[in-house]
Design a protein with these regions (language model features):
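Terminal helices and disordered tails flanking the catalytic cores of nucleotide-processing hydrolases
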Residues: 270, 275, 284, 294-477
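Sequence-structural signature of the catalytic-core scaffold of metal-dependent phosphohydrolases
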Residues: 1-91, 99-362
Length: 477
């Protein structure tokens, strides 16, 4: 047993065979050089990476397994039956981000459109690809949303670690399902419970680590979460021939709501901070320019489509396990460092220079929702109508027409900032004091489902800033 000291969870204990077979390998160690978040533009101390985060998710997962096994009578524990499921869960917790691309989620959008290709690549690695193909679509034939990095990590885990997964006593196909979050439609309700505890709507090992770790690393203050108490409240229960269900002690409701509160804070004030949104825009544009120069040998072209396609070539899925051996590159285990070194060759580009220097060429017209509604709220109009009106007028081409001869479209930048809002699932089950379990909905009423709240920022060049009052007046008209 290896012992690793972590600032968030204390000592993390990992089996020797997991260390040698998974952690101390090239693909996993690569995660030391994949930054966890984009928050450092505003919170400089947020210097944590996907490596320690993955270990943290494993630590949470191990405690969840211990909590479930402490109540063996709830589900009729049988070692030969349930241990392979628990071992699969622990490997999935450890490896769920093993193929995260450089700069984490920043470049994930460049894999969009390749989901079907990724699904095919994963099915090629599965023993039972037919049931996976059925289960990845809902009853309306709509495909469940699987993020590119989840597909990539599941594929990498099976391509490079399948033998090790089997040797540990786990089930490769189940590990892959846990990583991408696809539950079984028929039977396998116990396995589905474990899938939900790494890939759930509200509470899972993944979320419990990052809401704690991101807050600790960044230094901001928000709701506290008693993780130990919350984990101790988790049960998997089967009664009267029904399917297995994940249940939580009623005393944990406050802590569950605390997780949601921290997540909401992160969405509003960290992920969608105006500086972080602009910095992410710069990084994407800087890498698009870099890729266009290196692949197409064209640094003068301003064609956005060509530059985007060039970067998509660098983000081709197989580079995450086969390496980048094209366009003059010879890079294995692609990480943040590699993208940084590429960009340094083009410091004269405005996007590259701004990203490295933090000397931004554009400033936001408003910095928060409070700013926005103080500028544009009206007692006469519905807030949504007001928002839509400002959004429509703030299109850079509309602004260029309004200020024809004075400002150009390049003087304006509009960036969307989408907030993903979560609530306690209506299907979450609560274990009451009398030993029965009931849905959260039956106890507390129906909750609105997870949704997205749209918001946006308008950034102005230094020239446009001189017209700030006129721009506000036009948007308010």
């Amino acid at each position: 047993m290896k012992r690793i000291l972590d600032t968030v969870h204390g000592y993390i204990y990992i089996d020797d065979d997991l260390m040698s077979s998974f952690v101390d390998t090239l693909y996993f160690q690569r995660l030391r050089r994949i930054e966890q978040t984009s928050a450092r533009a505003v919170f400089p101390s947020a210097r944590h990476d996907r490596f320690i985060y993955s270990l943290g998710v494993y630590a949470i997962g191990r405690r969840i397994v211990d909590s479930i096994k402490a109540n063996k009578d709830d589900f009729g524990y049988k070692e030969a039956v349930h241990e392979p499921f628990f071992k699969s869960y622990l490997i999935a917790c450890l490896m769920h981000d093993c193929a995260h691309t450089p700069f984490s989620h920043t470049f994930e959008g460049y894999f969009k459109g390749s989901e079907e290709e990724l699904a095919i690549l994963l099915k090629n690695e599965l023993e039972d690809s037919e049931s996976f193909e059925i289960d990845r679509f809902d009853d309306n034939k709509e495909e469940f949303k699987i993020a590119p990095h989840e597909y990539l990590s599941a594929i990498l885990c099976l391509k490079k670690y399948k033998k090790e997964v089997v040797q540990y006593g786990a089930i490769p196909d189940l590990v892959a399902r846990m990583i991408v979050g696809i539950q079984y439609k028929q039977n396998h309700s116990f396995e589905n419970c474990l899938i939900s505890l790494i890939h759930g709507d509200v509470i899972d090992a993944d979320r419990l680590d990052y809401v704690c770790r991101d807050r600790w690393a960044s230094g901001y203050s928000t709701s506290t979460i008693d993780v130990a108490r919350l984990i101790a409240s988790i049960h998997i229960i089967k009664k009267d021939g029904e399917q297995y269900r994940v249940c939580y002690d009623s005393s944990a409701i406050h802590d569950i709501e605390g997780v949601l509160a921290v997540k909401e804070f992160q969405q509003k004030f960290v992920i969608n901070h105006h500086t972080i949104c602009y910095e992410q825009f710069l990084l994407k544009k800087a890498m698009e320019h870099t890729a266009n120069c290196l692949i197409n040998e064209d640094c003068s072209s301003e064609n956005e489509e060509t530059a985007t396609l060039a970067l998509k070539s660098l983000c081709n899925p197989p580079v995450m396990w086969d390496g980048l051996h094209a366009y003059g590159f010879d890079i294995d285990y692609l990480s943040d460092d590699d993208f940084v070194n590429m960009m340094k060759r083009f410091m004269d580009n405005t996007y590259v220079n701004q990203w490295f220097s933090r000397n931004y060429a554009m400033k936001p017209l408003w910095k928060s929702k409070a700013d926005f509604y103080s500028l544009f709220s009206s007692k006469k109009n519905d807030p949504l109508d007001e928002y839509n009106s400002v959004y429509r007028k703030s299109d850079p081409y509309n602004l260029e027409r309004e200020f024809r001869g004075e400002l150009k479209v390049e003087d304006f930048l509009r960036l969307n900032a989408e907030e993903k809002v979560s609530c306690i699932s209506n299907n979450m089950f609560i274990l009451t004091k009398n030993g029965s379990f009931q849905s959260h909905e039956s106890l507390f009423g129906h909750q609105e489902s997870k949704s997205s709240v749209l918001f946006f920022y308008l950034y102005l060049s230094s020239d446009a800033m001189r017209y700030k009052d006129r721009i506000i007046k036009y948007l308010n008209a």
